[in-house]
Amino acid sequence: MFKPTYLARLQACCNKFELADLLQIKVTFLTNVLYRIRPENQYKKFTIKKKSGGEREIFAPDEKLKDIQQRLSELLYICQEEIWAKNNIKQNVSHGFEKNKTIITNAERHRDKNIVFNIDIENFFPSFNFGRVRGYFIANQNFKLHPNVATIIAQIACLDGSLPQGSPCSPVITNLICRILDFRLSKLAVTYGCSYSRYADDITFSTNKKNIPDALVSNEKENEPGKILVEEIHRAGFTLNHNKNRVSRCTSRQQVTGLTVNKKINVSREYIKNTRAMAHSLYFEGSYTLIEKDGKHRKGTLSELEGRFAFIDMLDKYNNVEAKKNARPERYVVKGFGLDFKQRLNSREKAYSKFLYYKNFYGNEQITILTEGKTDPVYLKCAIDSLFLDYPQLVREEKNTKNRVLKVNLFKTNDKKNIFSICLVELQTIRGFSDDMVYFVKRMKNSLLKIQ
């Protein structure tokens, strides 16, 4: 028996009862959230620092509204995949908020190019107002939803008349609506022998031509976009933030979504040096300082520093994989660092290793328990959880939720943070786990001296 697609089921919906059923929620729950409590009363606003300076407003929905938005997001992602499969569409230009796409895949399209041109859409999320969201789902040839259903979707997604940054369903809706922009700009790029990609509001063109076409850049020295490009941006319902226009040639540092792309995908040397300096300060002074774009200093956290190390490590892994499959591996290899990582860590991995050692075995606020087997932490957690009344020093129970929280850290021996490659900072050979544990204990004193 033929089973209708999720897109067909969405198109068949005519009212809130049928949409609620498709989202697998009770219609009374949907009605209460949308029309009694109302979405504008269900957000918490906070700000985060922008890399370019200033602040970005984030609106986080409460649990009830977030649940509905997550369900809508998943439904629209499935519909998008069904549309792509039906029309044989290969999505390779939009990299923000897309599954299996990252800032790395976005930057890869512009690696080793003669000229890179970056532009930025101004007020990206506020550009998607209520009428635009509703109208898209009614008029778009792939959706053609009932007006009542399109209205409800816009009510779920919008705050104060536009899509808020922080909602689970804002990313997929922006990408759906931006598809026409991507199509037009991709066509423009191909016409003039360029590559194109978009990561949310960051748009990048690149070319190996001697000069970038006038249709894209009318004045390279002034970073002024071409008339045809500006017209296409306006035609799609957007405006440009001209303060972020940037033309970069291969003789200077070329960056795409914060990554350098001159020869290989990487972070800047300053980023790596600053990360190591922060770690050094943490080891010997007990804390480190982050400098905001506005010049203000604040104390950094372990999580923030771990994020920086993990990001550097992720790029190393990407370049190592590319080195193996590329015909010219020297373009990807980080010079000066050994790649025989089965037996030896390179300098970046050693720095990451040292930090993780500090975090788990020196600067840890809770006792860390090392186990032999991969499943041992699971068994220990279950045992401690079931005997929490007898061992209050190992577990506590939250008053409101009755959830039990461990007071110890069960070290997981999997993936990148395992006992083999991280804690044993200068591991020379691959041995059994028991031998590694003995080796780890023997080296503990020496390892501690490095961070004291």
Identify the function of each model-found stretch.
Residues K335-Q452:
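Acidic, divalent-metal-binding catalytic cores of TOPRIM
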Residues I138-I153, N175-A200, T204-I212:
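Active-site palm subdomain of RNA-directed nucleic acid polymerases
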Residues V116, S197-R198, T368:
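Hydrophobic "anchor" residues on beta-strands that sit immediately upstream
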Residues S197-D201, N243, N364:
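Short Gly/Ser/Thr- and Asp/Glu-enriched loop/turn motifs at secondary-structure junctions
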Residues I119-I121, K209, G373, C382:
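Residues immediately flanking
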Residues G54, I119, L163-S167, F361-I369:
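Glycine- and acidic
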Residues M1-K49, I58-E82, K86-I119, F124-S127, ...:
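Right-hand nucleic-acid polymerase module
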